[in-house]
Amino acid sequence: MRLHLLLLLALCGAGTTAAELSYSLRGNWSICNGNGSLELPGAVPGCVHSALFQQGLIQDSYYRFNDLNYRWVSLDNWTYSKEFKIPFEISKWQKVNLILEGVDTVSKILFNEVTIGETDNMFNRYSFDITNVVRDVNSIELRFQSAVLYAAQQSKAHTRYQVPPDCPPLVQKGECHVNFVRKEQCSFSWDWGPSFPTQGIWKDVRIEAYNICHLNYFTFSPIYDKSAQEWNLEIESTFDVVSSKPVGGQVIVAIPKLQTQQTYSIELQPGKRIVELFVNISKNITVETWWPHGHGNQTGYNMTVLFELDGGLNIEKSAKVYFRTVELIEEPIKGSPGLSFYFKINGFPIFLKGSNWIPADSFQDRVTSELLRLLLQSVVDANMNTLRVWGGGIYEQDEFYELCDELGIMVWQDFMFACALYPTDQGFLDSVTAEVAYQIKRLKSHPSIIIWSGNNENEEALMMNWYHISFTDRPIYIKDYVTLYVKNIRELVLAGDKSRPFITSSPTNGAETVAEAWVSQNPNSNYFGDVHFYDYISDCWNWKVFPKARFASEYGYQSWPSFSTLEKVSSTEDWSFNSKFSLHRQHHEGGNKQMLYQAGLHFKLPQSTDPLRTFKDTIYLTQVMQAQCVKTETEFYRRSRSEIVDQQGHTMGALYWQLNDIWQAPSWASLEYGGKWKMLHYFAQNFFAPLLPVGFENENTFYIYGVSDLHSDYSMTLSVRVHTWSSLEPVCSRVTERFVMKGGEAVCLYEEPVSELLRRCGNCTRESCVVSFYLSADHELLSPTNYHFLSSPKEAVGLCKAQITAIISQQGDIFVFDLETSAVAPFVWLDVGSIPGRFSDNGFLMTEKTRTILFYPWEPTSKNELEQSFHVTSLTDIY
């Protein structure tokens, strides 16, 4: 067991002083292509694709087949340039730097026609000394090289041996050799996304001028004294001292609400200097801890750090201080070989519930603050507490992590390496070293981040031999793997952040991987670490096909996004499941067939003679299939948290693949591009509920487990009802004796042979009846109402076509949908087209004549607009 104790401080800002000035170069720049035939203005931060679109030179890059039509943009070499006048007297400053927070990706930088440096890493922050070349009036140029061409050159130059994979599968329509360039890996395509290898200045760029000294980095390391039961804090400040003499002064650290104020004397010698301060927080002060969503508050404390230095130089930093501990528990389990794999936050075992995050857009300048908040609010609204930031995308922007801190979303943070082997030549390692060191400094202050992971699936790719490497050559690649992730990235993490755990890969066997010299024979073992699991052939309603693993960090099924989302980027001839557009948009080999196959196991496929109706019905059915499959699998993981069966179990995490979409296409996402909730996301709101009854069958016996994520025990009852498909009145019901549901456990609450249940309920057969159940106390509902199908819906007897009507009214900012049905209706789907917002529930089984559902609009709308856009579908409508 490894103990990681954490006190975190999120930087909020800094005061400017008389001894330093900053001048932003954000805004309008000039852009031209390689041969100078195309010149246009472009915004910074931004990229070439966005600039071309904003000038009307290209359409929306996501429209129809434009990912192929605009491939030329990524293959050209573009130049960004700007002329500007600095609004202060430059000669008064001892040091002037050009700061680039993010350059995408390969460029040569000229300042006043002097080459000052190069960039080759999208994830690094670059600082160039321009003291000797800067003037009052200046010019700057970034001459980009196509990342696609650069990657090909780097691969060609690596002559000693191949570093696979060379190219993505043809179905992805992507570019090759992405593993040779430190750029967003999915920008060369993925099985859910397009190929748009962008070029541009994608983050802030500015001039910094200073005298005496400058504070470059300001980071924090926590120390918790268990014996004294008190918090301490190490503050690490990195200075660039340009004074020729030592700089003395004092530092005042203040956290008012913790009644903490301490003063330190410091002296800085010329050059790059690090100051470490040790702050003690009295154990007599009650410190409120930061908790994940659903487990407590996200309490933070304001802190100021004031440096009062010689020469009248004052530098002030403000920060938000969060207190929490994180432990990754890997220890023996009675009755099972291997080790546990779960997290304790503030000493309490937490079941991680959530999903995997991918970039929200191929063009990061389109990812607004509003979109980030919308997507992350949807995470907690669905009762999730965790996101895994997947290693094939980007280290997200600061605001993403700030929102996760605020909302209580734990972050599993991958380093940006995915589904590939990587070179380990010195130039590549040097670039990675700078990247990782910078990202650790930037992100370590966030309480939301609970673990670093070295890569996505690269250990599995190597050991399961995805790339058909010969047995004799394998040691070369194992050596490279250990060099990159263990000897470099791991060492950087251990040196830069001792406050949270690190694992080399996902999936991995954790401590067992370490014992096996960093590469396990089976990284997907059910007895160690985490697993990734995908199976599109086995029946997803059969829980026995799922791994009873310690932690499921990836699993899922595809579906199509709603018609209103696809309509924006398609034309009328595209609106069929077998159209050229539908095949083009599917980047997962065989994906469309897999969806229909899985749906056909339990549902009748759409039978309309109208092609457009069939397309819409098929979209609906893929979302039903996806939601039901992921529900079955997630509920299996949740009910496995407290038990060992056949030596397997104690599952303590379920992160389905994937949360969000990068464009409008079929994928594993539960949120469509732009944020609209698929049926799966509504299901997640229920299957991730803090209290949940889970029903399943084993050997013709029906079981209901109670699952609790709560910290306390609660007294309650379980109600079980059986309906026939042909009646809105239950044919029988049963309420258990009152029992105590223990916090943080999953236990069996109900057990009955299916034959006995059917006999007890009169005329029921498997095909004619359905079971629903819920937890309550004193007539108060404590859980969602869950259900269990006794047979496939395609075999249902008595299921009638339901006539469902809705009366819409408004209450403040919320709209009320009063529904009425003529018959039992499975998978009732309420849709208001492109009107942004979400319902309180959706995709539900309607077994009562009336039901009230709320609609929460994300933008102003009206009752009339909703009535015009509203459409309701249930399962029998597609037959």
Swiss-Prot record:
<dbReference type="InterPro" id="IPR041625">
    <property type="entry name" value="Beta-mannosidase_Ig"/>
</dbReference>
<dbReference type="InterPro" id="IPR013783">
    <property type="entry name" value="Ig-like_fold"/>
</dbReference>
<dbReference type="InterPro" id="IPR008979">
    <property type="entry name" value="Galactose-bd-like_sf"/>
</dbReference>
<feature type="glycosylation site" description="N-linked (GlcNAc...) asparagine">
    <location>
        <position position="302"/>
    </location>
</feature>
<feature type="glycosylation site" description="N-linked (GlcNAc...) asparagine">
    <location>
        <position position="77"/>
    </location>
</feature>
<dbReference type="InterPro" id="IPR050887">
    <property type="entry name" value="Beta-mannosidase_GH2"/>
</dbReference>
<comment type="subunit">
    <text>Monomer.</text>
</comment>
<keyword id="KW-0378">Hydrolase</keyword>
<comment type="pathway">
    <text>Glycan metabolism; N-glycan degradation.</text>
</comment>
<keyword id="KW-0325">Glycoprotein</keyword>
<feature type="disulfide bond">
    <location>
        <begin position="167"/>
        <end position="176"/>
    </location>
</feature>
<dbReference type="GO" id="GO:0004567">
    <property type="term" value="F:beta-mannosidase activity"/>
</dbReference>
<dbReference type="GO" id="GO:0005886">
    <property type="term" value="C:plasma membrane"/>
</dbReference>
<feature type="active site" description="Proton donor">
    <location>
        <position position="457"/>
    </location>
</feature>
<feature type="glycosylation site" description="N-linked (GlcNAc...) asparagine">
    <location>
        <position position="280"/>
    </location>
</feature>
<dbReference type="InterPro" id="IPR054593">
    <property type="entry name" value="Beta-mannosidase-like_N2"/>
</dbReference>
<feature type="glycosylation site" description="N-linked (GlcNAc...) asparagine">
    <location>
        <position position="297"/>
    </location>
</feature>
<feature type="glycosylation site" description="N-linked (GlcNAc...) asparagine">
    <location>
        <position position="28"/>
    </location>
</feature>
<keyword id="KW-0732">Signal</keyword>
<protein>
    <recommendedName>
        <fullName>Beta-mannosidase</fullName>
        <ecNumber>3.2.1.25</ecNumber>
    </recommendedName>
</protein>
<feature type="active site" description="Nucleophile">
    <location>
        <position position="554"/>
    </location>
</feature>
<feature type="glycosylation site" description="N-linked (GlcNAc...) asparagine">
    <location>
        <position position="763"/>
    </location>
</feature>
<dbReference type="Pfam" id="PF17753">
    <property type="entry name" value="Ig_mannosidase"/>
</dbReference>
<dbReference type="GO" id="GO:0043202">
    <property type="term" value="C:lysosomal lumen"/>
</dbReference>
<feature type="binding site">
    <location>
        <begin position="190"/>
        <end position="192"/>
    </location>
    <ligand>
        <name>substrate</name>
    </ligand>
</feature>
<keyword id="KW-0326">Glycosidase</keyword>
<comment type="similarity">
    <text>Belongs to the glycosyl hydrolase 2 family.</text>
</comment>
<feature type="glycosylation site" description="N-linked (GlcNAc...) asparagine">
    <location>
        <position position="35"/>
    </location>
</feature>
<dbReference type="InterPro" id="IPR006103">
    <property type="entry name" value="Glyco_hydro_2_cat"/>
</dbReference>
<keyword id="KW-0458">Lysosome</keyword>
<feature type="signal peptide">
    <location>
        <begin position="1"/>
        <end position="17"/>
    </location>
</feature>
<dbReference type="GO" id="GO:0009313">
    <property type="term" value="P:oligosaccharide catabolic process"/>
</dbReference>
<feature type="disulfide bond">
    <location>
        <begin position="540"/>
        <end position="629"/>
    </location>
</feature>
<feature type="glycosylation site" description="N-linked (GlcNAc...) asparagine">
    <location>
        <position position="284"/>
    </location>
</feature>
<keyword id="KW-1015">Disulfide bond</keyword>
<dbReference type="InterPro" id="IPR017853">
    <property type="entry name" value="Glycoside_hydrolase_SF"/>
</dbReference>
<feature type="binding site">
    <location>
        <position position="456"/>
    </location>
    <ligand>
        <name>substrate</name>
    </ligand>
</feature>
<feature type="disulfide bond">
    <location>
        <begin position="732"/>
        <end position="761"/>
    </location>
</feature>
<feature type="disulfide bond">
    <location>
        <begin position="764"/>
        <end position="769"/>
    </location>
</feature>
<dbReference type="GO" id="GO:0006516">
    <property type="term" value="P:glycoprotein catabolic process"/>
</dbReference>
<dbReference type="InterPro" id="IPR036156">
    <property type="entry name" value="Beta-gal/glucu_dom_sf"/>
</dbReference>
<dbReference type="Pfam" id="PF17786">
    <property type="entry name" value="Mannosidase_ig"/>
</dbReference>
